[in-house]
A protein has these predicted regions:
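Phosphate-binding/switch loop-helix module in NTP-utilizing enzymes
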Residues: 1-44, 123
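Nuclease catalytic cores that cleave nucleic-acid phosphodiester bonds
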Residues: 30-33, 37-39, 47-61
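Preference for solvent-exposed, low-hydrophobicity sequence contexts
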Residues: 50-55, 59-247
Length: 247
């Protein structure tokens, strides 16, 4: 998120914007949330940070950031949203940006970021047989990347890396990542055009034999690159998984 926001800021300034305001939402609970706010302020090289209605947060950020930090009181009337309402609104926004069309993209002809299937195909029958005997599911594809291998298994459940043990680990010769075909459906992605603009997309399916991906997306122009995210949406566009490689 920090990288994407910084990129958007740079683009806006490059197109002549006098200033850029970034609304980071008001949810700041716990250390990771604090670090995220700080990283974002640093990532966009913020001249000023405005804290609304939270003196404790204001004091913390003032000690942590080189930016000018300002405090303003909360408005007398404000909307307070619970977890369920936030979830519903997020789902509605996903629908608004993703519904409207489908398309296929050949993953052989574009750059791929954030996906195991973008690695170099790696054939090792001993490794494949050893893994299949351990997890009880067919191995669809093995790819190699610097320092490890990624194993794509034909399973609806998410197979965990710790399930790959013993001889299979030794044959892999490094880090082992495991992706299940069932986890791929519903992964958020971005289709990048020739100008570097990222268009929202939702992965519907991947044919691993032809390396063709089907996406829900409004974008129908030329695709130069596909960036796979680490968020998986369910049928009602609710977030089911966050923070792990899913493709």
């Amino acid at each position: 998120i920090v990288t994407a926001v910084a990129s958007l800021r740079a683009r806006a300034r490059g197109e002549g914007a006098a200033f850029v305001a970034v609304d980071t939402d008001g949810w700041v609970k716990g250390w990771s949330a604090l670090e995220y706010k700080i990283d974002l302020a640093r990532g966009v090289n913020a001249d000023a940070v405005v804290v609304v209605g939270d003196p404790e947060l204001y004091g913390f950020l003032e000690k942590s950031l080189e930016s000018n930090v300002y405090y303003v009181r909360s408005p007398s009337v404000q909307a307070v949203r619970g977890v369920d309402e936030r979830r519903r609104l997020r789902s509605e926004n996903y629908i608004r940006f993703l519904e409207g069309g489908t398309r296929e993209v050949s993953l052989k002809s574009v750059k791929i970021q954030g996906a195991c299937i973008g690695g170099t195909p790696f054939e090792d029958e001993r490794l494949k047989a050893s893994i299949e005997s351990q997890i009880g599911s067919p191995v669809k594809l093995i790819t190699r990347y610097p320092g490890g291998v990624c194993i794509i298994v034909d399973s609806e459940r998410q197979v965990e890396p710790h399930e790959i043990k013993g001889a299979a680990r030794k044959l892999a010769g490094g880090e082992v990542l495991v992706v299940s075909t069932g986890s791929m459906k519903g992964v958020l992605a971005a289709l990048v055009d020739a100008d570097g603009v990222e268009h929202p997309a939702l992965l519907v399916d991947v044919d691993l034999d032809t390396m063709t991906a089907t996406f829900k997306t409004r974008f129908q122009g030329e695709v130069r690159k596909v960036i796979f995210g680490r968020v998986k949406l369910g049928e009602e566009y609710h977030e089911e998984i966050r923070g792990r490689i899913l493709v």
